[in-house]
Regions:
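C-terminal structural segments of small proteins and small subunits
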Residues: 57-95
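Extended, hydrophobic alpha-helical segments
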Residues: 1-37, 41, 45-46
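Intrinsically disordered, low-complexity boundary segments flanking structured domains
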Residues: 24-25, 51-56, 79-81
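Short, intrinsically disordered low-complexity segments
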Residues: 33-71
Length: 95
C-alpha cells in the first residue's frame, strides 16, 4: 500500500529531537519528497509499526501527523512536475 506521510513538529523544548526521530522513522520506510513529506510503500504489518512509532514520537498537543492512503493503484493518483524526481521504490535498485 502507498501512504503519504506528512508531519509538522514544533521546534521548542525537545522539538528538534522529536523532529529528528520522526524523520528517521519515515526514512526507514520511505523516501523524502519534501522537507516534512514522505512517500512510503509498506505492507499492513510495516504500516502498523511505522504509524505506531510516529504517534509515539510526537507531542499531540504541539505536533501533527497526516496520513494519506493512496492504496495499491497509486500510480494513477500521483503526478510529479519539476525537479527532484523520486526513485521507483518498487523497481529494481542497485546498492
Amino acid at each position: 500500500m502507498f501512504v503519504l506521510v506528512s508531519y509538522d513538529v514544533a521546534i521548542d523544548d525537545g522539538g528538534a529531537k522529536r523532529l529528528r526521530r520522526v524523520a528517521k522513522a519515515c526514512r526507514n520506510y520511505g523516501q523524502r519528497v519534501q522537507y516534512s513529506v514522505f512517500e512510503c510503500i509498506v505492507d499492513p504489518a510495516q504500516w502498523t509499526v511505522l504509524r505506531d512509532n510516529l504517534i509515539r514520537e510526537i507531542d499531540e498537543g504541539k505536533d501533527s501527523l497526516r496520513f494519506y492512503y493512496l492504496g495499491s493503484n497509486w500510480r494513477r493518483r500521483v503526478e510529479h512536475v519539476g525537479a527532484k524526481k523520486g526513485i521507483d521504490q518498487e523497481g529494481p535498485m542497485i546498492v
